[in-house]
């Protein structure tokens, strides 16, 4: 698998669930993801692109086919470029006419023509002419459409001179979605939209959208952003981000406004139903529903569109804050209760545990709250229960936890067992000087896996004034520190060396290139582009061992990605190195 190219840069800055806050850069312009692209129709500008830019929308999407088919727009775009045509300086992505193809059955342009046209008018992110097969089409039809899409992808790959989308199609057949994702992952594209889902979203078939997105994500390389084509209603954003969607586009802000519909994070309301505005955006702060109803239709539609945009933007910001705080699943749980079909989709997403668990951080800033039956199925909770079962059999002394069930008391100081809240109280038994080492060994077994406890045999544990274990030492040398915030172990140099001997290769290893070795030894962070291999079992925020190709220990630190991501990503930090280990 290639490491990609430099037309577009994408790196992950924070994460929760499969959701991520990323930095996307193209043509020297940067945005933070998750991001929403307002759809701009150059023939019907309900909100001017310049105003969108002032509102903080640093990326928009428009339709290159509409521009291509309109002689006046086409000639002007070719003369001055798309940015001057629209009066917008941010990132401009374009669709190719695929949506028109799905809606109306044909478009009067070839794949090569539209790709070359996109380059000539200076778009930042283009899209080739894929075939979006409608839901429930015969499988033979979906297969034939996908065959054409992949042929056009190969053609676009050969001629493209800009960053480009490669949409994953396949109708409602998850095996075709996986196949398309694998094939397109092997090609030189930058972003992967998941296409053909608008009819499903319009019909509230969110459960099927979950299966389509997860099937696609499972086969996609994880270093490329994913765009859920046509998903523009804020009620689905949190769920989609938890699946790993990075980009959205919204025409709904304008379409709903023209129909006197008012967006909220939970759904849509008709303007004539409202006595009060449940919002404090500039529009809702200035006008009452009655005042908007009395306005001329064109002005009313413009103001409703601006409100709808603020609601969309606010929900994206709320999601990003939830990711930062480790609270994304709580937000998804809350939003899912706005509609039975969304609730069904949320439950379906939790069925995809194997996919979700790979990206789920092992520790978070937030406590685990038992707020619903579904919260007991969150990936972090399920994983903690599975790991605890393994440790329980070795350490015994079980206690009943209101969220995690039977857990050895030696894990009850550690995240998430200690950092959790349920209806029933759970008391923590502090260690004694005599049994504190049992706590440390159980934590090691839970944190690093089978037999990791052997690295701490014979060690002594110093207790803090609070009675909690802190420093773990052997013969006066520090092996590890038990972190106050989450009860996990941060390795010292001696602890890393002992763990390295105990754990067979490649467990908890991140293998770096010869070029990165001297920097790792000096305690410098490891960047993903220098990672040659990593233990697939590594999860975000695990404590890991950095080694060279000879399995010589170079450093210890905290993983910022899963093991598989480290191998694929070209940009961003893979390991936050805590301590380097000098050679010799």
From Swiss-Prot:
One of its GO terms (molecular function) is RNA binding. Keywords: Glycosyltransferase, Metal-binding, Transferase, tRNA processing, Zinc. It is an enzyme of class 2 (transferase). Residues 507-582 form the PUA domain. Its EC number is 2.4.2.48. Zn(2+) binds at residues 279, 281, 284. Pathway: tRNA modification; archaeosine-tRNA biosynthesis. One of its GO terms (cellular component) is cytoplasm. Its cofactor is Zn(2+). The active site is at 95 (nucleophile). It comes from the Archaea. GO terms for biological process: tRNA wobble guanine modification. Substrate binds at residues 130, 196. Belongs to the archaeosine tRNA-ribosyltransferase family. Exchanges the guanine residue with 7-cyano-7-deazaguanine (preQ0) at position 15 in the dihydrouridine loop (D-loop) of archaeal tRNAs. PANTHER family: QUEUINE TRNA-RIBOSYLTRANSFERASE. This is tRNA-guanine(15) transglycosylase. The gene is tgtA.
